[in-house]
Structure formats: C-alpha cells, structure tokens
C-alpha cells in the first residue's frame, strides 16, 4: 500500500470515527440549539468528507490516465498500428491480385469452353 493510500485510509477512518462519535452524543431535549449545532456539525463533516474523497478520486483518476498514456506510448502501440496497417495493405493487395488472376483464368476457361461448343 502506498503512503498516500495509507494516509487516505487514516483520514477516512478518522472522519468515520468522528461521525460515529457525533451521532452518539446525547441530545438534550430542553435545548433545541444544541441539537441544531450537532446536526450542522454532522452535515459539515459529511460534506467535508465527501468533498475530500471526490477530490482524491479525481486526482487518482488523472494519475491513472497519465500512467496508461505513458505505458501505451512505451509499448509502441503506434508502431503496432503502423505494422497492422501495412499488413492490411499487403493482405488487400494479395487478395486483389488473386481476384485479377482468377478472373483471367475464368475468362480463359470460358473462351475454351465456347471454342469446344462451337466445334461440336
């Protein structure tokens, strides 16, 4: 586990512990202001946690994308794409040459068949 992940987990644990403790504080029914303050504190801590966690996920996603981008460049995906394009071109050229040859053979066979039909 990396240091940043460990720090994040510690931070998340502390936030969850704080939320749990805040929810366990006894509510005084005589004083509505105390309940309102606790409620505001809970909402603030939940909002702060959500905001910080979202920022962390955005940064992690950006780092993962950059890592992926660098890895694909290093592996030579661009070179592979060029090789695939050349292979497709050569395959297409071969197929085209075969089609031309087969068309000529078919025409030659047809002419020979016509000649044989004319003799008979």
UniProtKB/Swiss-Prot annotation:
Coiled coil: none
Residue ranges the record assigns to the propeptide: 75-86
Pfam families: Hormone_2
Gene Ontology cellular-component annotations: extracellular region
Key words, A-Z: Cleavage on pair of basic residues, Hormone, Secreted, Signal
SMART domains: GLUCA
Gene3D superfamilies, per database record: 6.10.250.590
A Gene Ontology molecular function term of the record: hormone activity
Subcellular location: Secreted
Purpose of the protein: Promotes hydrolysis of glycogen and lipids, and raises the blood sugar level.
Record-linked PANTHER family: GLUCAGON, PRO-GLUCAGON
Similarity section: Belongs to the glucagon family.
Name of this protein: Glucagon-2
Naturally occurring in which organism (per UniProt): Petromyzon marinus
Gene: gcg2
């Amino acid at each position: 586990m990396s240091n940043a992940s460990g720090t994040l987990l510690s931070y998340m644990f502390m936030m969850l512990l704080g939320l749990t403790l805040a929810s366990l504080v006894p509510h005084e029914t005589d004083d509505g202001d105390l309940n309102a303050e606790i409620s505001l504190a809970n909402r603030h801590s939940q909002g702060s946690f959500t905001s910080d966690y979202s920022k962390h996920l955005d940064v992690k996603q950006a780092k993962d994308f950059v890592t992926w981008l660098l890895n694909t460049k290093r592996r030579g995906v661009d070179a592979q794409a060029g090789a695939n394009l050349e292979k497709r071109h050569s395959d297409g050229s071969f197929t085209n040459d075969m089609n031309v040859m087969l068309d000529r053979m078919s025409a030659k066979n047809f002419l020979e068949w016509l000649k044989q039909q004319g003799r008979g």
